Amino acid sequence: MLFKNRHVISMKDFSREEIDHVLDTAEKLEPVARGEERSRLLDGKIVSLLFFEPSTRTRLSFEAATQRLGGQALNLGSVEASSVMKGENLADTIRVISKYADLIVLRHPLDGSARMAAEFASVPVINGGDGSVHHPTQTFLDLYTIRRESHLEDLRIAMAGDLKYGRTVHSLCHALSLYGAEMTFVSPPELRMPPEIVRDLKKQKIRVKETDSLEEIIGDVEVLYMTRVQRERFPDPEEYEKVKNRLKVTGDLLKAADPELKVLHPLPRVNEIAPEVDATPHACYFEQAFYGVPIRMALLALAMGVIE
């Protein structure tokens, strides 16, 4: 299975076998991610982090992943301090950064920017999130979390919150379809899963249900994947105010849940998960954030060819 010099742009570029290989690699590297073992797999390698959108977990976990493997991370810093503010286009930026680093991690607000960057890069490009469409490394870590805390095959999962603009759930739908998941989409009518995604899933014979009620489905699912309503994706602030607090996971709601239910969230959260949930055995979102480190370690090591 060849991963060396491969770009990581969309989950649709990966087969189930390839996804499983990434997850297996992450599991082998997890002791290094936890600081229990040391590794020099990326000794002498430089990873450039080009983030044109705010990020905490994705950026820091890529930095941690690079350093845990003995590599060095070059951080662009603020966009305001870069040549982009002088009018340099993304293609030229990518061409130049390719000369400085062995791999580029890109986060950008425009749909398709990572795919375009890969065309101009002379080193592997990993998509750290572009526009509202793709966020493959988040999906890999979501799959890894589900595999570690529950199971992937024939999973019963509900995705709730902002399903219209949420790139994490869009990527996750495709990936879980490879494992025969049964999916329930919970959202206000204004934030439903895009109809083309629902159609694609149904064509693959995936069972799909849509509702606006968490209470209706909480006892029937094994994983609940919550998302925040993203203020920055709303052109109209009034529309955001109408929907921001419609769905919330509380201790009372979880009384009706399966005892083995796991609650995931890509973070940051706002009001959609009450703090009281944090202390329950259902809460997996902080461990989920940690799992981003071994997953990104695996993707870095595979793309740079230091592990097979």
Curated annotation (Swiss-Prot):
It catalyses: carbamoyl phosphate + L-aspartate = N-carbamoyl-L-aspartate + phosphate + H(+). L-aspartate binds at residues 86, 167, 228. It is an enzyme of class 2 (transferase). The keyword Ribonucleoprotein does not apply. InterPro entries: Asp/Orn_carbamoyltranf_P-bd (IPR006132), Asp/Orn_carbamoylTrfase (IPR006130), Asp/Orn_carbamoylTrfase_sf (IPR036901), Asp_carbamoyltransf (IPR002082), Asp_carbamoyltransf_Asp/Orn-bd (IPR006131). It comes from the Archaea. One of its GO terms (molecular function) is aspartate carbamoyltransferase activity. The keyword Transferase applies. Carbamoyl phosphate binds at residues 57-58, 107, 135, 138, 267-268. One of its GO terms (biological process) is 'de novo' UMP biosynthetic process. Its EC number is 2.1.3.2. Pathway: Pyrimidine metabolism; UMP biosynthesis via de novo pathway; (S)-dihydroorotate from bicarbonate: step 2/3. Keywords: Pyrimidine biosynthesis, Transferase. Catalyzes the condensation of carbamoyl phosphate and aspartate to form carbamoyl aspartate and inorganic phosphate, the committed step in the de novo pyrimidine nucleotide biosynthesis pathway. Heterooligomer of catalytic and regulatory chains. Belongs to the aspartate/ornithine carbamoyltransferase superfamily. ATCase family. PANTHER family: ASPARTATE CARBAMOYLTRANSFERASE, ORNITHINE CARBAMOYLTRANSFERASE, MITOCHONDRIAL. This is Aspartate carbamoyltransferase catalytic subunit. It comes from Methanosarcina acetivorans (strain ATCC 35395 / DSM 2834 / JCM 12185 / C2A).
